[in-house]
Amino acid sequence: MARRSQSSSQGENPLDPNYLPPHYKEYYRIAIDALAENGPEAYEQFLMEEGAPDFLCPNEVEHISRSLQRPPESGQENPYPDSVYGSQEDADGSSGTYWPMDSDTAAPELDLGWPTIYGFQGTEVTTLMHPPPPDNPTIKEEVRRMIRSAQQVIGIVMDIFTDADILSELLDAANRRIPVYIILDQMNCQLFLDMAAKYRVNLNYVEFLRVRTVSGPTYFCRKGSTFKGNLQEKFLLVDCTMVLSGTYSFMWSFEKIHRSIAHIFQGELVSSFDEEFRILFAQSDPLIPSESALAKMDKSYMGMVPFAGPRPMFDRKLHFMFPREENPSQQFPSYGVDPDRHYFQPFRREDMIRQTMDPGGMRMYGKNLGDPMDKMQMSFVQNKQLEAMEAFKRHSFAEGTFENYTSSRQYSRQMFMNNNDEYRLQSSQVQKSQFMQFQSPLGTARPQGLFEKIRGGRQGLQEMDEFDSRYPTKGLPGEGHFALDGPPMRPGYNPSNSSREVRHGSDQMVIGGEGRFGQRSLGRQKFMCQISPTQKQGMEPKYFFHDQDADKKPQENKQGLRSWRISSYLSGIQSDQDEEGLPIPLDPELYDDALVPVERAVPASDTLFKYSMDPVPPYHPGTAPHDLPYDRANENPMKFSMDPVQLHRPNVPSQDVPMHLERAGNESLVKYSLDPIPPFKPNVAGTDVPMPLERKPTANEILSRYSVDPIPPYKTFGSTGDLSVEKAKENPPAEKEKEEGLLSRHDSFRTRTNPLIQRGSRLRSSLIFSSSKLEQHTSTAESVQEMQKEQSTSELVSENETGRTTSKVAEILQKYRGINKDANSTTVTQAKAASRTIHEESEDGQSVSAEEVAYKAVESTVDTKGSMSHVQQESQYRSVASSHLESLLGKHQTTLSMSKVEQMTSSIQTIGNISAAPSESGPTVPELSEVHKQSSISHMQQESHYKSVVTSKLEGLLNRDQQVMSMSKVEQTSSTIQTIGNISPAPPDSKESGPTITEVTEATQSSENLPTRPNSAFHFGSALESMSQNPTPSSSLNKSEEDLAKTDQNFFRKGSMRLKQFLQSKAEKKAEEDLASDNAKAEKQHSTLRRLSKSDSQEVAASTDMEEKSAKSLSVSPPKTSSISQSRLSASTSNVIFSSNLRDDTKVILEQISANSQKNRAEMVKQAQQIQATGDPDPATSKPESKTEGTASTDAAAITRTGSFLSRSRFSRPSPSSPEDRDILLKRMESIRKEKRVYSRFEVFCKKDEQPSHADDNDDKKAGKIIPKLLGNLIKK
């Protein structure tokens, strides 16, 4: 039995269902050994004795007999030097029994380069048959198409390659500088070499072609004999993204007589072929060409002529058609320096003479418009005349070569004699396609400018109009530089600035920068002056050794495109630069947009002296037109005198100035400018007057072409009155227009700054309040002046939505314009408290009043025009809405039905929409005060009659309906009132139109006798007090609404739902717009905010002390008050979301407000005491009300007690102005926050999103619990 190490089925389980029995048979091995040692007869004899069938076909027997290699005998010369039994044993003393895992011989390298594929776009397989179905291409056609479409690399693995058509395609691809790797079968490679010899192709001189051979696995016999197999893999790999694999071989017979199949794989399956090709190439051996392939050829054009298509129009001697002559005594080979080898150089070159060997980076095509040329009589000998002119040609794409022509040519001769090693590329230096695509200069003109050339991918190509008349065509008889109409060129060339950009990246490239040997050429860029700025090289030593430092000029006021984009982007992040990242000179230059260096202009005499040795003929009027620079736009040869040197030289007639003087002036000035496109219009020939600067379209004009909402000019937006007026005084109109252009241009390039990101910093809030101390004690006259200035500015704003949208852009732009420049020119909004009340009349004449308080703390918003215009909108809205409401109430004060309630609510919203439009035109302050005064007088006339009607109706309702309605009806009506009060708020003045309780009516009536300034502050404080201390009007009105809903419940329910849906969007929009106020009302806001914060904290603290009592009074009216508290909290915090971090910054805000508003609070207390002393409660109203409450129910009595508590405690509470009271207040607020009684911003976000999607009942359940508890406790008292 065999040992375990000798078992071929080691590790396999015979009981496994997937077990595959081994197919190895011992007599196979013995029969092969007999065949290898003694021949076919011994093989057949062994099979006959063994009784086994023949397992080899005759072809296999013949192959083994033909390819068998026997081991060398001792003392006998090895007949197989390339076999595994070479003389290596004697050299290194290694034993034949030692088999290392890794070879110490380096694997061959893919020296022409190999692309790296990082990802695939899916997998696609296409099956090809031969012969093909009808209307389908053959496999050979697909092979040729794939080779022609190659851009990076071509890899072929083939057993037999004898198809000349495919070889012609491969040579064409190699001539396009695409690496071509061919791996052939080692035994059949001679067939490929014979085909190359037949068509006169010398494979040693095809630069981008590598041919290697691979054999099959080696079989080792018992006595040391070996034989190898064939390479039967067949596939074509193109760009590592496409593979054609199958049974098709590159032979004539496979195209004509054999049936075959092939598959085209695209996608991820190509990676396996990629790996297999690199493995085969690493195991391959070099191809040994035959002597016939290296034989000299007598006829030049015998090679590949029938297969290369039509002959070119000029002698394009292919370098692989000329054998190398081994004649070291001759300086140059007889076939000379091939122009194609000169022209098609490697994409990146590391040697020092790359510019000399790459003359101009392209073939200089030109056209002699005057002399006809015979294209068929050109020869390579005539082309060699250009060698003496190479120093005068433009340099290649990169710097770093010898400027001395003699030394460079001597170095070039040495390289040519040294096996052309300088033309070998490294493995990492493959380029997609470097075959130039040329365009006829007589065709359609391409767009000028650097950016258009970059987009078109034609930056390095030159056209005929860019060649000047420096080199007369008579120096090259019989040709106009080169033939213009050559063979058809292939597209896909992506030129680069230089090899330095490819290796080091484009971020280190400087447009127009200097190389290692002086100023770099800008010849590959188009210029509007139609004259190439490339400095032509003279043969004098003065030019080669001129002072390079004298040419260097610092560029201070101009930057490259990349630097400008970087600074423009950084200006959106760093706001410490003046003009959005552009360095602005202190004094504006007269020609700031000119491409002239700021320091000094180059004198024309210096330029003439420097280039006086140039072989340039002076200009004469009789010169032929084709010798002048060709202007493609105007067809005028003389219209090129628009050089920037005219701005700095005396007015000399252009006829008296030589052409090379003007050209040198142009070149010296444009040479040192980073922007190669001068913004000047062409001057008329013969005039030397400095041309005016071409007006550039402003940024707004450019944006208006591509955007729906163009940005209005910046002057329309002015930050505040002072800022806009002072800026207009400081800057003249020209500077102001320039300034606006800079701002708008930078703003169009960078991303808009999100105002929501720059929020919520405690330090920022404290700094804002500390800076606002300087502005708190401004006089009333200054405030009125600011308001008037702002009014005049706001009149320029359009009345459509575009003006409102772009005002936010103006706010963002204004942030970056010196906030710290002038403290008086900016207004910092500190805080704002807004009280809105909406009143509606019920069927019985009872007033529905729902108040909401929006507490806003704006931390870091610098006011622009929007703040003043918004204040004016509010004041006008109050006056118009209150007067309209009072007129409506006067008409329908006795017989208002439920339908009238809905009509009136819609009227309120209509007034808000109508009054919003006129408010943008900017009404003056006297108009606002006059309207407000008229509305107050009309209200006082109607109030006396209205109070009696309301009292009688209320008494009748309470006597008639004493039963408590069900909980569902209460929730429905309360949610409706909450929706009206929350979503459609009116300004505070409108609450005077419909008072319900006697105490509230008298308080508001007496408040109208005050002056204007204390009046607004008093109304503000009254609204806050009434909402924070006791929401009695809401609860009493909700009680009356229960009785009303009982009579007409269905109609009221439908109407409320329609109101809620209709008013939702407008209320949110109004709440968001109500953001800031001006500096004139800062003291009033401080006082009202102080009242709000203390009252809020007190009611929240009271709610925590009396939690156990709130459950008992839940059946009376907690659902109603919950709705009102919800509306109050949601409206206030929804605005706070966009303005401040209330939870983090309230302590700092309250400290600053309380410290700054001591004087105002003292004045408010005095005014409140005066009002309380002069106020006369109406006994006729209070008595019937108390009587009704005593006879009707305990709920009404509780409401009456609450109302009396409101009247007693409204103005009697002393102002806690001592530091101890403030400390107690702050401690309470901190304790409440620790118990999470205050909504955070994130909770408000969630609640705001969930409110519209739930029913009314769910909205009531989600309301805050602070106000209901407080109300319940007050009612129980």
UniProtKB/Swiss-Prot annotation:
Q: Which GO terms describe its biological process?
A: intermediate filament cytoskeleton organization
Reply yes or no: does the keyword Cytoplasm apply. yes
Per UniProt, the ranges with Basic and acidic residues bias are 724-750, 1247-1263
State the UniProt keywords alphabetically.
Answer: Cytoplasm, Cytoskeleton
- Region Disordered: start-end pairs: 1-20, 67-98, 717-756, 772-805, 971-1018, 1070-1130, 1158-1225, 1247-1266
Q: Where is the composition biased (Polar residues)?
A: 1-12, 777-805, 971-982, 993-1015, 1112-1130
What SUPFAM superfamilies has UniProt attached to this entry? Phospholipase D/nuclease
Question: Out of the domains of life, which is the source?
Answer: Eukaryota
The places in or outside the cell where this protein is found are:
Cytoplasm, Cytoskeleton
- One GO cellular component term, please give it: cytoplasm
Instruction: Look up keyword Cytoplasm and say if it applies.
Output: yes
Biased composition (Low complexity) is annotated at 1204-1215
Name of one Pfam family that matches? SACK1
Under CDD domains, the record lists:
PLDc_FAM83H_N
Record's InterPro entries? FAM83, PLDc_FAM83H_N, SACK1
Family the entry assigns: Belongs to the FAM83 family.
Protein function: May play a role in keratin cytoskeleton disassembly.
According to UniProt, the name of this protein is Protein FAM83H
Lineage of this protein's species? Eukaryota, Metazoa, Chordata, Craniata, Vertebrata
